[in-house]
Amino acid sequence: MVITMKQKLLFSSLCAALVVELPTAVQAQRLVPSQKGLEVSASMPIVKGKSLFKQDGFGLTLSLSHYLKRGKYTFLSAGYEQQALSYRSYQVPLRDYLVQMGYAHPLLSDKGKNVFFYLGTSALVGYEQLNRDKMILPDGAKLLDGSRWVYGAGLHTSVELFLTDRIIVGGKAQLRYLFNSDVHRLRPMLGLGLRYQL
């Protein structure tokens, strides 16, 4: 089969057009209303008097996001968090199992819609487990605080970066307030998440 010069030129032109048009066509698929995302994130609580990276506290969260118009989104997440409270020579375990529902609003983004800065609010409810539901410590002391159901509100900021059109990495800072917790009502934390757009 003989390939003519016109066919080579046509083929080259089509390839060049695809390369030029592909980024804008794919970019148009970002932040589509009703698009959903699945996110896994890890976090660390910020505890007064403890080094951020030398503590045993951590959190894991699984979230489902739903995009609205103009890059806004709502989310529903389920998370587990743990940290240790110091009492004499003991470390009293504190664990939280929380469900969080919230809204995120984009405040800033770059021209190419690759990086976004979000501010959001949330409501949360869950169970706070103190010392594995045991009221007596190993030295015989009795805890005045116990495990309980908790509820609260949160304020969060995030910087989200599109690695590809479907994969987003985000750094987050959250401030949660648990109204009926006897241990720490104010819970600041830092986190890092990876979201896949479905």
Regions found by a protein language model. Name each.
Residues 63-137, 196-198:
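Gram-negative (and chloroplast) outer-membrane scaffold detector with strong preference
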Residues 28-35, 69-71, 108-117, 163-167, ...:
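Short loop/turn motifs that connect adjacent beta-strands in outer-membrane beta-barrel proteins
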Residues 1-34:
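Cleavable N-terminal export/targeting peptides
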Residues 37, 57-61, 96-100, 150-154, ...:
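Transmembrane beta-barrel architecture of outer-membrane proteins
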Residues 37-41, 73-77, 116-120, 168-172, ...:
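Residue-level detector of the transmembrane beta-barrel scaffold of outer-membrane proteins
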Residues 186-198:
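Outer-membrane beta-barrel "beta-signal"
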Residues 26-78:
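Short glycine/proline- and aromatic-enriched beta-strand/turn motifs that initiate or cap beta-hairpins
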